Amino acid sequence: MKVILASASERRQELLKRIIDDFEIIVSDFDESTVKFNGDFSVYVQELAKGKAESVAKDIKEDAIVIGCDTIVAFNGKVLGKPKDETHAFNMLKALSGNVHSVYSGIAVLDTKNNNISTESVCTNVKFSTITNEKINKYISTKEPMDKAGAYGIQGLGGVFVEEINGDYYNVVGLPLNRLYKIFGDMGVNL
């Protein structure tokens, strides 16, 4: 059966290749602003992932498995998405400096054959070292943080700020492979 990843993220594509040899990429046009945050990060990311999977699946005319995913950083009860500009990135990184934050990913796996959908979320806690303003500005000048939730990439230069991680590393990168693999098994998807 065809597998479709509803994401433009190169990181997710690279991770998915570890468990699936052949898949298509169809970028979701889902309007994330239609999902309102109700205070529960886990539910929020699952709804975002579900919306992405469903927006791609509606146009698929054959049997397929569609994977939607969304990742956020949560700190002090707030969602830290991708930074709007360099000042926003600086403020995010300054807030995370010396503190623990949580990374949530929602996964939605939709089987178009029977319209069965499974959604789950994964949470990983990450502790940052204390970062000087100079180091934050130097990191921002690389442009790496500009397309990443929480303004850092653990798999890139931003990984040097990570002092400790409790949970799934791949979740912080953007696709919790272990949970996705389990969902496939529970849904009877043969890889």
Curated annotation (Swiss-Prot):
Q: What is its EC number?
A: 3.6.1.9
Q: In terms of one coarse class, where is the protein primarily found?
A: cytoplasm
Cofactors: a divalent metal cation
Q: Which SUPFAM superfamilies match?
A: ITPase-like
InterPro entries associated with the record: ITPase-like_fam, Maf-like
- Site Important for substrate specificity: give positions: 11, 71, 155
Name this polypeptide is given: dTTP/UTP pyrophosphatase
The superkingdom of the source organism is Bacteria
The entry lists its GO molecular-function terms as: dTTP diphosphatase activity; UTP diphosphatase activity
Name the reaction it catalyses. dTTP + H2O = dTMP + diphosphate + H(+); UTP + H2O = UMP + diphosphate + H(+)
- Coiled-coil segments, which residues? none
Q: Kindly identify the residues recorded as the active site.
A: 70 (proton acceptor)
